[in-house]
């Protein structure tokens, strides 16, 4: 549920002008999520959302810049520990199996960290396909994933 909710928060912040936690909580409730202000506050912190100037004397929530932060890596580690059940590789492809409904959240976290060895990710419901830049990069990627699970 948390992964879906946080994915929805990212969508809302990209698509709408969200100025306050209350507005975000209301938008989440309209989308079918039962949330408290404390939950919204924690999600904002975990996702690294920032407030940026909007119009005159106003601010809105926005996605953070595409820089790798310690928080992004910690979020990915938590998601791996909580949601990833296995992974394997073939040539320059890595397939990750997750709990049902978790693949898109994990793939988004991988994309946010922006590993230079990874060309891209494709996520379904419980499976992620990672395309490495070349097969020589795969051991390095898998070593990082191994660290996340220990």
UniProtKB/Swiss-Prot annotation:
It holds the Pfam family Arg_repressor_C. Its main location: cytoplasm. Transmembrane segments: none annotated. Keywords: Amino-acid biosynthesis, Arginine biosynthesis, Cytoplasm, DNA-binding, Repressor, Transcription, Transcription regulation. It is found in: Cytoplasm. One of its GO terms (molecular function) is arginine binding. One of its GO terms (cellular component) is cytoplasm. The keyword Transcription regulation applies. Pathway: Amino-acid biosynthesis; L-arginine biosynthesis [regulation]. InterPro entries: Arg_repress, Arg_repress_C, Arg_repress_C_sf, Arg_repress_DNA-bd, WH-like_DNA-bd_sf, WH_DNA-bd_sf. One of its GO terms (biological process) is regulation of arginine biosynthetic process. The keyword Flavoprotein does not apply. It comes from the Bacteria. Regulates arginine biosynthesis genes. Belongs to the ArgR family. NCBIfam families: argR_whole. This is Arginine repressor. It comes from Carboxydothermus hydrogenoformans (strain ATCC BAA-161 / DSM 6008 / Z-2901).
């Amino acid at each position: 549920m948390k992964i879906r909710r946080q994915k929805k928060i990212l969508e809302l912040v990209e698509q709408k002008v969200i100025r306050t936690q209350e507005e975000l909580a209301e938008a989440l409730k309209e989308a079918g999520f039962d949330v408290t202000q404390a939950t919204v506050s924690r999600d904002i912190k975990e996702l690294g959302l920032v407030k940026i100037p909007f119009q005159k004397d106003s601010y809105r929530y926005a996605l953070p810049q595409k820089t790798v932060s310690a928080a992004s890596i910690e979020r990915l580690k938590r998601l791996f520990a909580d949601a990833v059940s296995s992974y394997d590789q073939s040539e320059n492809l890595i397939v990750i199996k997750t709990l049902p409904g978790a693949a898109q959240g994990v793939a988004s976290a991988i994309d946010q960290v922006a590993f230079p060895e990874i060309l891209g990710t494709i996520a379904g419901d419980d499976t992620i396909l990672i395309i490495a830049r070349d097969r020589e990069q795969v051991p390095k990627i898998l070593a990082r994933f191994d660290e996340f699970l220990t």
